[in-house]
């Protein structure tokens, strides 16, 4: 590979979980009881997790370095400056918005504002908390993943479009979803991920985007 690319590489960071996810990993299922049985201790644990995550991600940035004055995140996006990404809020699928606002949001905001910008990873099952996440300062792009047993991410996004107006949305779409959402995609900045089945499919989709969304 080094010969193929003539020694030119774009290093990317791995990214980090949010403080809630790290605490969940440490506490296991008892984490969800902690909200009710020992909330003060949980808040102290979350502070520790946020501090540890910043320390860990700073080490990643130190190792990866900057690319054209920015950072390539764990999902391959380039963000300006010392950016954090991906930062994950998967645990919000299992807690209420009120719990996120009280326990998670302050620490997520602390992590985001430590850096110049952030790439956030979320899930459609977190629909109830998505507006609270999107309102955190510093989030430049927010991925919304689809989940089983709920509406597709693009439909969840459209329902909450006004409340999620801050970050650039990142949506993994099928060909059918792309073709049926031209109006949405033409009306705003959107990062589209598409899983091509082969090179021909990828080239065909690239041609479709060049035709329907010409660079001005």
Where are the predicted features?
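Active-site loop segments of alpha/beta catalytic cores
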Residues: 1-216
